[in-house]
Regions:
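Alpha-helix-loop-beta-strand connector modules within alpha/beta enzyme cores
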Residues: 46-68, 112-138, 167-183, 221-232
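Catalytic cores of alpha/beta
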Residues: 16-21, 79-90, 140-154, 175-183, ...
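Hydrophobic faces of well-ordered beta-strands that scaffold small-molecule active sites
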Residues: 5-9, 27-31, 69-73, 96-98, ...
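Glycine-rich phosphate-binding active-site loops on the catalytic face of alpha/beta enzymes
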Residues: 31-37, 95-105, 158-167, 187, ...
């Protein structure tokens, strides 16, 4: 990845938004979260998408560029997770992010409520043959030690965790095995990014700042990181 900062899933909501990322300083292009069927349920606005099959041509197009493409997926069953991961991997996605951080996922799949379900989901996700990671909710109902052990055992590469102490820092302190950590929310400055990387994060995702600033956020963060590094 050319730069350690990327957009968060769901922040680039149109094909034009996604294509604009190609000319930016982002380290990767993260797509909107996709489901097996088109999702238009009014109670779950954050999950609305046209269905995975409408995004596959865009993945194939983006895969021809130098930037990594991250497909974000959500499913109601372990089988749906496995199916979506394989579909996007075959289309050329560089990595697959399965979100557990959504109310619809918590109400249907509920991957963090049962160790057997978690292992089944993680195994099917990792079987796609691409690097995979899981996006965690702000509050995880199981011990991080058990969570990370299950993910690593199944072959999942990393997790996306919040910037709060109860998120990525606590996870890294309690994790029984090495796992890549991507900080998923709450960072707004180059200083924030540097601190997260110094604490062990592999990369960060930006959500609200990207929505307000657009693709210019990446160049700004890069400039701020350079200034911080030069001042030390």
């Amino acid at each position: 990845m050319p730069f350690c900062v990327m957009n968060a899933a769901g922040t680039a909501t149109t094909a034009n938004d996604v294509r604009a990322l190609r000319a930016s300083r982002t380290g990767a292009i993260v797509l909107m979260t996709a489901t097996v069927h088109p999702f238009v349920h009014p109670a779950f606005r954050d999950m609305q998408n046209p269905g995975f099959d409408k995004l596959l041509p865009l993945v194939r197009e983006l895969a021809e560029s130098d930037l990594p493409v991250v497909a974000s997926i959500a499913g109601a069953t372990p089988e749906e997770i496995g199916f979506l991961a394989k579909a996007f991997a075959d289309a050329g996605a560089s990595a697959i992010e399965a979100t557990f951080a959504d109310r619809w996922v918590e109400a249907t799949l509920a991957p963090l409520e049962d160790p057997a379900t978690l292992h089944d989901v993680a195994r099917r996700l990792a079987a796609c043959g691409r690097p995979t990671w899981v996006k965690l909710p702000d509050r995880v109902p199981m011990p991080y030690r058990a969570l990370v052990a299950a993910l690593v055992d199944a072959g999942v590469r990393g997790v996306v965790a919040s910037h709060e102490f109860q998120g990525y820092e606590k996870l890294m302190l309690e994790a029984p095995a090495p796992i890549d950590v991507i900080v998923g929310a709450g960072l707004t400055s180059g200083f924030d990014v540097i601190r997260a990387i110094q604490k062990g994060a592999k990369a960060v995702q930006v959500g609200a700042p990207f929505r307000s600033e657009g693709v210019a956020i990446f160049a700004r963060l890069e400039r701020e990181m350079t200034r911080v590094a030069e001042s030390n």
